[in-house]
Amino acid sequence: MNFEDKLQIQLKIYDDRYVQIGDKFYEINDKGEPNFDIEYENVGSGYDEDGNPLEATAARFIDVGKCLIFPNTSARLVGLNDGQQYVYSYEIIAPLSKRKYNMLPHEGDMVMITKKDGTINKEMEVKGFTTYKRRYLKLWL
């Protein structure tokens, strides 16, 4: 497969010290990138001193790497975790490496996809995902 398109995942930033990718939290290093060596739990949950729920203070996209983007031209369905059937817009296939396992998006996460020829440049919500033999990631958007 010739992976030529681009996939980015949204980072949610909390207190300029932690980032959330999927359901995991990591500290931000001096370069502003996630430090995948130490994982934190429940940084984004809880309440502030006024009793308001903690929310991300900022968000940005980080490059996951190359991928293939396939539009759903046949109105195919994918089954979601809640049992619903969903007609997805795009199917994404991306190669995985050990480094990328910390950046797996989950249902509800936002990703940005960019086609090499510029025909697609969209921010979309992940509706479903799976991994194949720890070598490939498949997303339905």
Language model: regions and residue ranges:
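Short, conserved turn/kink motifs that form compact alpha/beta structural patches or helix kinks used as
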Residues: 2, 6, 16-19, 25-141
